[in-house]
Design a protein with these regions (language model features):
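Walker B beta-strand of ABC/ABC-like P-loop ATPase nucleotide-binding domains
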Residues: 1
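PLP-dependent aminotransferase class I/II
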Residues: 23-100, 104-107
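Short acidic/glycine-enriched loop/turn segments that link adjacent beta-strands
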Residues: 38, 110, 144-147
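Conserved PLP-binding catalytic core of the aspartate aminotransferase-like
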Residues: 89, 99-133, 149
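PLP-dependent enzyme catalytic core of the Aspartate aminotransferase-like
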Residues: 129-133, 138, 142-170
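Short beta-strand-to-loop capping motifs
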Residues: 46, 116-120, 153-155
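Active-site pre-lysine segment of PLP-dependent enzymes
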Residues: 4-33
Length: 170
């Protein structure tokens, strides 16, 4: 099972592998690129025999009518989807470069967020400064990794505010 929750923001995906191998399944969600996190609506791409096996055990009412209507409307508006996706990609690139200018090491992202660590100081005080100013990012400190920040791509205004606050702290 390949989880492609962020595939719409990536340069490549694994959908074609489904045709090559009957045991490969790809799951997608409308939570990220379609902005429907609250609906918890997704889908599975697999060969027909795999789908048939899932249908044998699925609940008769596994999706409610509101979620189906929301998902149908979202999928039907590909212009909005493409505009939103392109905006996220542009803003992600701007965030990436802005963080690098402030001394961060930024891992190239294939999602709607970036992961960064600062080359000369810990991330925790930066995280606290952002939180104190009502800018919420995720602080992570995993064994074997430098502590770092996971920053979601927001609007241009949100990214400007985030970068300005970070600049005050570094």
């Amino acid at each position: 099972l390949v989880d492609e929750a962020y595939a719409d923001f990536a340069e490549f995906n694994c959908i074609d592998l489904v045709e090559e191998n009957p045991k490969i399944m790809v799951s997608r969600t409308l939570s990220k690129s379609y902005g429907l996190a609250g609906l918890r609506f997704g889908f599975l791409v697999a060969q027909p025999q795999m789908i048939a096996e899932f249908c044998k055990v699925k609940d008769s009412y596994n999706c409610d009518a509101i979620s189906i209507a929301g998902a149908t409307a979202a999928i039907g508006d590909q212009q909005w989807f493409n505009n939103n996706r392109n905006k996220v990609l542009e803003t992600r690139q701007r965030l990436h470069h802005g963080l690098e200018k402030l001394g961060f090491d930024v891992i190239p992202s294939q999602a709607n967020f970036v992961w960064c660590t600062h080359s000369s100081q810990p991330s925790k005080p930066i995280y606290e400064h952002l939180k104190d100013n009502r800018v919420l990012v995720r602080y992570m400190d995993y064994e074997g990794w430098s502590d770092g920040l996971r920053i979601s791509v927001g609007t241009d205004e949100q990214i400007d505010a985030c970068l300005s606050l970070i600049e005050m702290k570094v």
